[in-house]
Amino acid sequence: MIAALLIAADGVPTAAGGGDGVPIGFRIFLAVLALGGLAIAAGTPFSRRLHRNRAVAALSAGGWFAVLAGIALGPVGLDLVDEGIFSGLRPLVVVALGWVGLIVGLQARWKILQAVPGVIWTWTVKDAAMSALVAASLGAIVLGLAVENAFAHPAALFAPLATLAAANLSWAPETRSLRVELSDRTRRIATLIAAAAGLSAIVAIALAGLASLPVRADGIASTLDPLLGGRRLAVLLATAAVVGIGARFLLSMVERDSPQMLVVVVGFVCIVAGVADAAGISPLLSGLLAGVVLANLSTGPLRNLESVLHRGETAGGMLLYGFAGVLVSVDSGWAPLALGFAIAATRILLKPFTLGQSMRLAREELPTNTPLRLASVRQAPLAVAVAIALVLVEDSTLARTLLTAVVIAGLASGLAAPLQSWQQRSSTAPTSDSKSDL
């Protein structure tokens, strides 16, 4: 992969910045080494031990470490990764997004979807409608105030607002970092939370990806072209179907060999994500459709395939958080800060409400002091991937502003849940015990 990036760098112009005089190929190598090292470190046993600490788990769940590392490497910090270097790293970002889409798409197996309880479908639809409406409304208000004549070009706002709405849908499915007291009831509730998060992830990628299909990106002069959207969708479906059938055949030949299976999957992702990127389509959406095709064609190899993919899930998430840090915009004024914190605040108010309603429908009573009440507050890492996909499809100031807002919302919501949980535990702790803890 690094060799391919270095070869591709021959045609990438060197951008001005902190790396003047340093060969661009070497700078790409250093950037891959730094971001790749961060991703690999996230999956080590030492990192897993660190995550047992509540503060470390909270910071990493919101992507703080990786985002700060990306900011340090980007134009805001050391300027190791400037615009020219990011162009050289683009293939790596495309493959990473395709990988994430594939993991989510593999959950959309028809037999599994048929077995999903009605309460989870109800929860997903209700939460998606409310969350998308709130996020899009906040985005329209803030951008209307921050961007001059923003509503004079509604087509330019279509994909960004849809992306912002999609980023606000899902939540982090893991509950281990919340330090929940284990019981049969909390295990059932945690399972429902994870299942609904997976379903929301599918909806989020589909919403953002499909909304970008008819957009002919040209900054503020972007236009909507339904015929272009139809052609792009046809390309996506044809690529996913043809390559999926071929991958299914190859996977059946190597299902007992994990390394060979990984090679097949990486090649599969490179093809579908690369075709999508060349056609101006979100690699995240192409990965999702490819995963759906593969999940519904495969039988035996699927279980082994999922285990192979999930081994790299944490590393992939950290890699995308790092890229998000590189791409954040510091020249957008107050808009990203206001929008990010506003979305985080609405998540704190809205998500526990929809969670509580859904648990009542499922006849599961949430304990008043359980941290699970706050589980859906934390923005899913997928939100960052959705925002990065928008930047790849439409690299504009508006797209980077929304990416920055999504990153801020993720960091804030990632801290809000543990802080509220800590406050609840502190308020219920006996006064006499507090002295002995010091």
Question: For each of these PLM feature ranges, what is it?
Answer:
Residues R49-A61, F65, A72-V119, L251-D257, ...:
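Membrane-interface junctions of multi-pass transporters
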Residues V116-T122, D184-A206, A221-L227, L302-S307, ...:
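Membrane-interface alpha-helices at helix entry/exit sites of multi-pass transporters
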Residues V32-P45, V67-P75, D79-L80, V95-Q107, ...:
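Transmembrane alpha-helical segments of multi-pass membrane transport proteins and ion-pumping complexes
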Residues I40-N53, G62, V67, W110-D184, ...:
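Transmembrane alpha-helices that form the ion-translocation and gating core
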Residues W110-A115, V147, T175-A234, S252-M253:
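Alpha-helical transmembrane bundle and helix-membrane interface signal
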Residues G21-L38, I85-L102, F151-S170, L228-A240, ...:
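Structural signature of hydrophobic alpha-helical transmembrane segments
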Residues S427-L438:
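Short, highly charged, low-complexity non-transmembrane loops/tails of multi-pass membrane proteins
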